[in-house]
Regions:
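Short helix/turn-capping signatures at newly exposed starts of structured segments
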Residues: 16-117, 156-160
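C-terminal motif of bacterial Sec signal peptides marking the signal peptidase cleavage site
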Residues: 11-15
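Short amphipathic beta-strand and strand-loop transition segments with alternating hydrophobic
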Residues: 79-81, 118-120, 140-146
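Short Gly/Thr-rich strand-loop-strand
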Residues: 110-134
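Short, exposed beta-strand-loop hairpins at the edges of beta-sheets
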Residues: 131-150
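Short, low-complexity, Pro/Ser/Thr/Gly-rich segments in the mature regions of secreted, periplasmic
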Residues: 146-160
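Bacterial N-terminal signal peptides that target proteins for export
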Residues: 1-2
Length: 160
């Protein structure tokens, strides 16, 4: 599980185009970033997540293990992973096209009553890693945040 978390953390998604539909959740005002709360219904099915994400563009959903969504302005992507023997929702990755990690960290800490701590051993010049544990949706989760000069990627995962 940690290998999957690390691999997803180092991957960023970029895209071109898109529409400017103002009804899509997680949309940004140009020059700002908006925290997006993904589906945290751990163990749920792909159909449940698809219903939750109905306002987003499904970029990839061709298998039973992952769904990838983008908001209309391509400033936020959300990847859902369905791992384990039951293929229930077990990991969520949200990537923001922004350099404003402090805002995202603050929102996570405030919403989920947790502290994200800088991981000096994993951080390098231009790349900073934060981690923490908390409870979301009644489940203990691990949170890993990877910040570069252009993106902030947050990985939420259940440890079991």
């Amino acid at each position: 599980m940690m290998a999957v978390l690390a691999a997803m953390c180092m991957t960023s998604f970029t895209a071109c185009g898109g529409d400017d539909d103002d009804d899509v959740p997680g949309q940004d005002v140009p020059g700002t970033v908006t925290y997006y709360e993904p589906c945290f219904d751990w163990g749920s099915t792909t159909d449940h997540v698809k219903a939750y994400m109905s306002g987003w563009e499904l970029v990839e959903g061709s298998n039973d293990y992952a769904l990838l969504y983008s908001n209309g302005r391509n400033t936020t992507t959300v990847t859902y992973a369905f791992l384990g023997s039951r293929h229930g929702l077990s990991m969520v990755t949200v990537t923001y096209i922004t350099s404003k990690a402090t805002y995202i960290i603050s929102e996570i800490e405030k919403r989920y009553n947790m502290t994200l701590t800088k991981d000096d051993a994993s951080s390098q010049k231009g790349d900073t890693v934060y981690s923490g544990n908390g409870t979301i949706g009644g489940r203990t989760i691990a949170v890993l945040l990877h910040s570069t000069g252009a993106t902030v990627t947050v990985i939420y995962g259940i440890p079991d």
